[in-house]
Amino acid sequence: MSLSWWRAGAAKKRMDDDESLLVKQQQQQCVALIVGVTGLVGNSLAEMLPLPDTPGGPWKVYGVARRARPSWNEDQPMTYISCDVSNTGEVEAKLSPLSDVTHIFYATWTSRSTEEENCEANGKMLKNVLDAMIPNCPNLKHICLQTGRFHYVASVVDWKINGSHDTPLTEDLPRLKTNNFYYTQEDILLEEVKRKEGLTWSVHRPGTIFGFSPYSMMNLVGTLCVYAAICKQEGAVLRFPGCKGAWDGHSDCADADLIAEQQIWAALDPHAKNQAFNVSNGDLFKWKHLWKVLADQFGVECGDYEEGQQLRLQDVMKDKGPVWDKIVAENGLSNTKLEDVGKWWFSDTILWNECRLDSMNKSKEHGFLGFRNSKNCFLYWIHKVKAYNLVPSTYT
């Protein structure tokens, strides 16, 4: 893994200037609890934290997810804990004994049918974890909460109806007058950290994430790879299932490794404490350019934007289960079902709306100078999906 730590810039000087902090970190091992370890960013954190050149590292890592440990992360050096964090008793039994945890990275969520239910369910999950950890971890120093860019729009479910802030989106924008489970989570976090003197927090708000996780509900790169593989199997053109604004307008994304780097930075750098940060790659792209990249990777004809089309992958892919089963069998792929690897609702959400661009100025002003080339980032995660045998690796 190629790391692009903030250390290359101003933040290294800031941390080097604080010698007492560095000495303290060297004397005590950093111990991470990653909640949502099988998600896009959780997976990146689990790969990154145990490395010897990671700041504060090598970290000891506990990884928490609801399902049993998957085969694709078995080689990650961590203690894996299968735990449903919505179950208060299970959380208390399985997490409260982890008394050596120094940092919590919370990067999970659940979806319900209404935003009111989202607020209740996601708020309970976070509070369960914090109730189990804060009283039982004497050396707990920092909590990273990952939310997202929907902080700036009215609702994850119907944001076009309820409105949003004008762009570029900045961290100091006021909350909208609507239900949003990110607001609920932040309120719980800020209240819970008061229970322990010196406990700090940070909130991280990525937009569309490019990363790797077969279990993520928002796995855009993996979903598009599956779509392209099906087009190849059927000899079909890779049509663009989205709007003109997404095809020809400017978009951005956040590399999962970059988000993990920002969270580790915020967990260790005193200048990042008790702050909320946007996180994106720092450049812009157009989907019409990345679409050609995707087509080339799967050896299919690249479609153009079709004026007036209403192509949505949720509709197009609903009967493609047998096609996917055939692809898996013929290519000796990992045994997956289409509904597990294709998150069509999410690709439709992203590609049928113009991107709401954010600003990275606050993050840079506080010392985090990390960035990614989004085209290279897209290619990297496509290659990772292939490397884990989830889609065919070679096409001509």
From Swiss-Prot:
One of its GO terms (molecular function) is oxidoreductase activity, acting on the CH-CH group of donors. It comes from Nepeta racemosa (Catmint). Iridoid synthase that catalyzes the first step in generation of the iridoid ring scaffold using the linear monoterpene (6E)-8-oxogeranial as substrate. Iridoids comprise a large family of distinctive bicyclic monoterpenes that possess a wide range of pharmacological activities, including anticancer, anti-inflammatory, antifungal and antibacterial activities. Catalyzes the conversion of the linear monoterpene (6E)-8-oxogeranial to (S)-8-oxocitronellyl enol, a precursor of nepetalactones, which are metabolites that are both insect-repellent and have euphoric effect in cats. InterPro entries: NAD(P)-bd_dom_sf, PRISE-like_Rossmann-fold. The keyword Oxidoreductase applies. It catalyses: (S)-8-oxocitronellyl enol + NADP(+) = (6E)-8-oxogeranial + NADPH + H(+); (S)-8-oxocitronellyl enol + NAD(+) = (6E)-8-oxogeranial + NADH + H(+). Coiled coil: none annotated. This is (S)-8-oxocitronellyl enol synthase ISY2. Keywords: NAD, NADP, Oxidoreductase.
